[in-house]
Amino acid sequence: TVEGILQISNEGYGWIRTGNYMEGDNDAFVHQQIIRNLGLRPGDSVLGMVGPARVNSKYPPLLQVTQVNGGEVEGLKDRPRFKDLTPIFPNQPLTMEHGKDSITGRAIDLVAPIGKGQRGLIVSPPKAGKTTILKRICQSITINNPEVHLFCLLVDERPEEVTDMERSIKGTVVASTFDMPAENHTVVSELVIE
């Protein structure tokens, strides 16, 4: 059995990435026929059965898909594509303030309010406090909005900051640290967006 996130190559075949959206020893190869027949897309969470590894292959092949994104396998081809959806302004606010000591959250609510479905990019020089602010945002979202499934993508960060974030928030932390190639940053970011 294998469970992970599907990454699809330009040639049409793919891999189930089991280790934090990146290549790992427990990954599985997915033939393009399975991807095409089921209507699988990059970023899908796939659960399935693998066969024995082939002699000339690095990863064992995926033989059968049991679940996709926690649900049934049927009807995946009918899903709307993200790029075809109508973009709208966020109309449900995510309150950042929680308690009297939440100064960062209060400031964000006043200066740059955040809404459900909104994406954000924080860019700043090193040691400016961006990771601390991002940690506070993630903590506020999980405290004030427990129904939200939180993803936190860290790109070009130090491994220590990734570990701190994983320990500090309740949600999925996906990271491509500064010691990884720029190509890896792009691949991981695209998988999370999908």
Question: How would you describe each model-predicted region?
Answer:
Residues 79-88:
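Short solvent-exposed strand/turn elements
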Residues 14, 156, 192:
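Conserved RecA-like P-loop NTPase ATPase core
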Residues 11, 186-189, 193:
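Hydrophobic alpha-helical segments
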